[in-house]
């Protein structure tokens, strides 16, 4: 397939990686040679309940990552993050990226319920995809990191689909909001309404001992989501005795940590750190 490298490179360098054009540029250069993709698989009854799965070219059982994209809980599409699925699958990790209900058509906690349903579906079908359901990880960027971490910490949502956090070998959070009250964007008051329930939206409020291992990464140049979110969550996890690692990247912006999965943008070194984390935690037993 012919690639327009100069145009894509210019777009990726000049645009924020989380804009539509920036994501298009990053997807333009994703390679199709080292993975396969199955698209628009239904994981639930709603129109938004569709997922794509990216599979390694080799036949050995792989770890399985469910990736949650960001977009402020009101935008985003799985197709825009093909470059993430491609990077992980090319490295030998089966990857699921799903669409979920978005504001204003839906409000919290509907996108959490969709997330839990997608995880349960992925786990149930892992063997069909050549993946190991016992090596299941969650990963998200921005609002997606919020969803991934809250899903791992607040047991309510996985319980609703017959599971719990023991399903998970680990969680990766990239540029995530975990401790963000009071809201700085007015529309979030409606996304997470009523105000009496705002506390339920905060992952930091659900930290407990024996949480799944976490790798939390943040750019110190992030002007959208303060790195203090990662600092405060990591401190709370450490105080609870949980396994948590952090990496902070000087100068990296909010979108840089997602863009780093593209062949165009290999810095900061997010992908190798994710691969190292998945390999290390896959080797450890997770109690049932």
Question: Which residue ranges define each predicted feature?
Answer:
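N-terminal cap/lid segment of alpha/beta-hydrolase-fold proteins
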Residues: 19-59
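Mobile cap/lid helix-loop segments that gate and shape the active-site cleft of serine hydrolases
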Residues: 30, 46, 176-206, 212
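Short beta-strand element of the alpha/beta-hydrolase
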Residues: 61-71
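Catalytic nucleophile-loop/oxyanion-hole region of alpha/beta-hydrolase
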Residues: 76-80, 84, 96-133, 263-266
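Primarily recognizes the serine-hydrolase "nucleophile elbow" in alpha/beta-hydrolase
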Residues: 117-186, 198-199
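Short beta-strand/loop motif that positions the catalytic acidic residue
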Residues: 216-218, 222
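Conserved alpha/beta-hydrolase "acid-adjacent" motif
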Residues: 223-229
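C-terminal catalytic histidine-bearing segment of alpha/beta-hydrolase fold enzymes
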Residues: 231, 238-288
């Amino acid at each position: 397939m012919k690639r327009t490298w100069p145009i894509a490179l210019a777009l990726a360098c000049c645009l924020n990686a989380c804009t539509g054009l920036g994501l298009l540029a990053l997807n333009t250069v994703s390679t199709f040679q080292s993975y396969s993709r199955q698209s628009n698989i239904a994981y639930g009854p709603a129109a938004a309940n569709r997922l794509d799965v990216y599979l390694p070219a080799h036949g050995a059982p792989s770890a399985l990552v469910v990736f949650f994209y960001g977009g402020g809980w009101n935008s985003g599409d799985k197709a825009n993050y093909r470059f993430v699925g491609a990077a992980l699958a090319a490295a030998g990790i089966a990857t699921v990226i799903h669409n979920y209900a978005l504001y204003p058509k839906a409000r919290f906690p509907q996108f959490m319920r969709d997330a839990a349903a997608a995880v349960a579906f992925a786990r149930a079908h892992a063997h069909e995809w050549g993946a190991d359901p016992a090596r299941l990880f969650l990963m998200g960027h921005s609002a997606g990191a919020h969803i991934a971490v809250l899903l791992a910490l607040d047991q309510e949502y996985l319980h609703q689909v017959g599971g719990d956090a023991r399903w998970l070998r680990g969680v990766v959070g990239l540029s995530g909001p975990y401790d963000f009250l009071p809201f700085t964007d007015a529309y979030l008051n409606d996304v997470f309404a009523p105000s009496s329930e705002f506390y339920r939206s905060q992952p930091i409020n659900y930290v407990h001992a024996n949480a799944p291992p976490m790798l939390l990464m943040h750019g110190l140049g992030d002007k959208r989501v303060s790195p203090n979110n990662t600092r405060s969550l990591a401190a709370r996890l450490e105080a609870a005795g949980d396994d948590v690692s952090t990496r902070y990247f000087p100068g990296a912006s909010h979108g840089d940590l997602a863009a780093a999965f593209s062949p165009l943008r290999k810095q900061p070194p997010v992908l190798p750190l994710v691969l190292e984390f998945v390999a290390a935690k896959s080797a450890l037993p997770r109690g049932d």
